Amino acid sequence: MSRRYWNIDLEEMMEARVHLGHKTRKWNPKMAPYIFTERKDTHIINLAKTARSLSEACDLLFDIAGRGKQFLIVGTKYQATDLVASAATEARCHYVNRKWLGGMLTNWSTTETRLQKFKDLKKEQDTGRFNQLPKKEAAMLKRQLDQLQKYLGGIRYMTSLPDIAIITNQREESIALGECRTLGIPTICLVDTDCDPDLVDIPIPANDDGIASIQLILNRLTSAICEGRALRSL
């Protein structure tokens, strides 16, 4: 795996509050290697460790993006929903930013069926067929389409399982993480001081509740994906 310079600035991470962990009583002892100190009953994350992990993750994403691989970004907690959609759209990644539907990956055949239903309903709407139906039936189909758009809109173009998943909150996305582990899909995950870093392939110690923190980490990761793809197209 190639190593590059990703302009990861410790002061910028401080300003984004990446270093702020949870209350000390909530900690997971496995996060001890990533904790710098505690202040007012709050654990402070070692940003040097964060920078090292983030750089490693960026190197990996750059390399596999250059090989045309596919990415899935997952973040359904309210702080992350808009950030995930924006970052994933800009980097042309698949994403889930609403409720994770159990079996979305492990029961991929069912997900494919739902995606096909979504595409069929979208086509019917776009061609004006809804307008030709009785109002009650059209309203029912519109509700179905809205639900599918809400939960599957971010993966509507996903035709196979992703090659790697980026997860913004380990505890909130435990089902998604579990499915990735079951299927052997590599994971990059923000891990706060109450998380278990052993559950992911590349843990990035960081505040997983703060909007600025999530945004900074996501921006660095998706920039690496974009750079890898740009190099591939040369």
From Swiss-Prot:
Primary location class: plastid
UniProt record similarity statement: Belongs to the universal ribosomal protein uS2 family.
Record keyword Plastid present: yes
Coiled-coil region(s): none
One term under GO cellular component: mitochondrial small ribosomal subunit
Name of the protein this chain belongs to: Small ribosomal subunit protein uS2c
InterPro entries: Ribosomal_uS2 (IPR001865), Ribosomal_uS2_bac/mit/plastid (IPR005706), Ribosomal_uS2_CS (IPR018130), Ribosomal_uS2_flav_dom_sf (IPR023591)
GO MF term list: structural constituent of ribosome
Subcellular location: Plastid, Chloroplast
Classification via Pfam families: Ribosomal_S2
GO biological process, one term: translation
Assigned keywords, A-Z: Chloroplast, Plastid, Ribonucleoprotein, Ribosomal protein
